[in-house]
Amino acid sequence: MLKATISADIFKDTVDALSALVTECRLHFSETEVWARAVDTANVAMIILTLKKEAFSQFEATTGEIGLDIAKLKNTYSMMGKASDIRLEHQEGANKIEVTFEGYHYSITLLDSNTIKKDPNAPGIQLPGQVTISGSELYNVIKSASIVSDKIWFAIEPEKKEFVLYAEGDSDNIRRAFSAGEVIASNWEPAKSLFSIDYLKDMGKVMSHAEKVTIDLGVDHPVKFSFEIAGGNGQVEYLLAPRIEAD
């Protein structure tokens, strides 16, 4: 059972974070939080999203899960005002979630959880390098890199104390180095991995709204992006597998 009220901004930020990677997911809820963990169809990227009950203006729930069609939730956006309060309600055993705001009432059919890809296990991999930069800065580099290539290198250069993003195309290239004064660095450890820009553009659009994004990185390992939503009452983690170039 779930009965909750949430602002339109937080609702949209949450749905957008999920839709950057997946079209459907299991949504879990308990007395204290709502959470989802899902991978894309190619098993290349993962999202782990949590909203504490404090993200809601009203929250009442018992432990359970439902299968969400994220595209259907996005279809409700067009009628939402920025100041709208969104009422969400699901009765235990029902196959619908009720979404109500400003006189509108959507009754959205749920997906069978058994038909949705199983929740992935959170990876236990240790990524030695870590930097924190603004989400908008990160997205700007990704957009610029997409003009010249479909892939981008992320690197930490400890000797220079720089976090470097660069892309190489057939004839052009782009490089952006963030100095120690531009980033918050927890670990200036050597790191360098190559990633698909297609995935990063979708993630980056979501991350562009975050004041700070923490990036954990290794050598030819996945990258992890962590950032807050809902005024600090929510957390999103994206993990993206590297592209391995043939010698």
UniProtKB/Swiss-Prot annotation:
The keyword DNA-binding applies. One of its GO terms (molecular function) is DNA polymerase processivity factor activity. Keywords: DNA replication, DNA-binding. GO terms for biological process: leading strand elongation; regulation of DNA replication. Homotrimer. The subunits circularize to form a toroid; DNA passes through its center. Replication factor C (RFC) is required to load the toroid on the DNA. Sliding clamp subunit that acts as a moving platform for DNA processing. Responsible for tethering the catalytic subunit of DNA polymerase and other proteins to DNA during high-speed replication. HAMAP family: DNApol_clamp_arch. Belongs to the PCNA family. This is DNA polymerase sliding clamp. The lineage of its organism: Archaea, Methanobacteriati, Methanobacteriota, Stenosarchaea group, Methanomicrobia.
